[in-house]
Amino acid sequence: MNNEQFMTLALKEASTSQNDLPIGAVLVCDNRVIAAASNQKERTSNPLNHAEKIVIEEGLKKIGDFRGKNIKLYVTLEPCPMCAAAIILSRINEVYFGAYDLLYGAFGSKINMSRIMNSKIKIQGGILENECSKILTNYFKQLREEEYGKPERTS
């Protein structure tokens, strides 16, 4: 599979997020998916349950080593500082993300955790960026409509 195909799987995970921010992540080892998840902060009432953190915990447990070897992470939104630190400490080799996060992005948009933590991790953003951005835009649009109602059309 290629980067776009793995990101498509992450998008599918994001679409299962129910009332959570629709972010999906897929952890890949030797070109095989070893973990997939969406955000679960609202579902679990735990603000730390980001999709990235969940797949790292599940995936590294499956391979039996907390140091990722030949592991790639695909996530629909640029990781936040907490997730970026977890990625680096887990020694994940490559990170591919879809949409850039101009508020909290920790791999270049706002800050660069890989430089701060002296990591040699490979990072590439913008994989299926439009699709990843659209799912987030639609989520926030729906939230606004639920809060304030649909905007009235004027002729």
Regions found by a protein language model. Give the residues of each.
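Short beta-strand scaffold segments in enzyme catalytic cores
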Residues: 23-31
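Short secondary-structure boundary/capping segments
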Residues: 25, 63-65, 113-115
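Conserved Nudix-box catalytic region and its N-terminal flanking loop in Nudix hydrolases
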Residues: 43-46
